């Protein structure tokens, strides 16, 4: 019995050590990662098309991103608007680009919504933000980091609150398509 308890501690310590090493490897990888998109580029394109009808603005933005980054934006037949419930807010998103370290998506709400930013390492204690979007708010969203780790926040409301498993499937399929596109572009060049 004593040996069994001791073995559990050894396994727990080993698991903790593996997790620490894995976290360090991911941290180092992100530090050396070259990104496809730049914050300034996405912001400039968003400003360029601001004020247009959102459908026209989004279609022009997609064309421009494909021109600037061939092989990194999903083709039209794989673009799909998906409902999103996260942090208490609701809207719709269309994933344009996804990799292990960055994403670009279109997001909006026709009715307006509010919620919170979630708990992240960016926000210290008491610094999490509330968000509120009015009716017909549409935007381009760009994110960097360990993207698979953000899926917990993005999908928790869908799994445990709305239990909309079809939306869960569509969301995961969109992300898988983005990863597949990045992988084939990496292996075969810009025209997978």
Protein language model features and the residues they cover:
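Short acidic-glycine-tyrosine-enriched beta hairpin
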Residues: 109-133
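Conserved hydrophobic/aromatic beta-strand scaffold that supports enzyme active sites
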Residues: 93-95, 120, 130, 139
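Glycine- and acidic-residue-biased ligand/ion/polar-headgroup-sensing regions
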Residues: 101, 106-111
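A short, N-terminal "cap"/entry segment at the start of jelly-roll beta-barrel domains
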Residues: 25-99, 186-192
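Double-stranded beta-helix
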Residues: 134-189
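Tight coil/turn sites that cap or link beta-strands
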Residues: 99-101, 124-126, 136
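N-terminal Sec-pathway targeting helices
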Residues: 1-17
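Eukaryotic short linear interaction motifs
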Residues: 103, 130, 148-150
């Amino acid at each position: 019995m004593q040996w069994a308890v001791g073995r559990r501690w050894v396994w727990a310590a080993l698991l903790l050590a593996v997790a620490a090493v894995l976290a360090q490897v991911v941290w180092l990888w992100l530090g050396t990662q070259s990104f496809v998109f730049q914050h300034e580029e996405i912001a400039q394109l968003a400003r360029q098309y601001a004020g247009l009808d959102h459908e026209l603005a989004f279609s022009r933005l997609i064309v421009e991103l494909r021109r600037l980054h061939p092989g990194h934006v999903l083709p039209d037949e794989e673009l799909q608007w998906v409902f999103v419930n996260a942090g208490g807010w609701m809207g719709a998103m269309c994933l344009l680009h996804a990799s292990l370290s960055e994403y670009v998506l279109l997001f909006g709400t026709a009715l307006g919504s509010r919620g919170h930013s979630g708990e992240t390492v960016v926000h210290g204690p008491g610094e999490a933000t509330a968000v509120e979007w009015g009716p017909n708010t549409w935007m381009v969203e760009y994110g960097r980091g360990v993207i698979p780790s953000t899926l917990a926040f993005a999908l928790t409301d869908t799994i445990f609150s709305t239990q909309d498993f079809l939306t869960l499937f569509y969301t995961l399929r969109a992300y898988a398509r983005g990863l597949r596109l990045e992988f084939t572009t990496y292996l075969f060049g810009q025209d997978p």
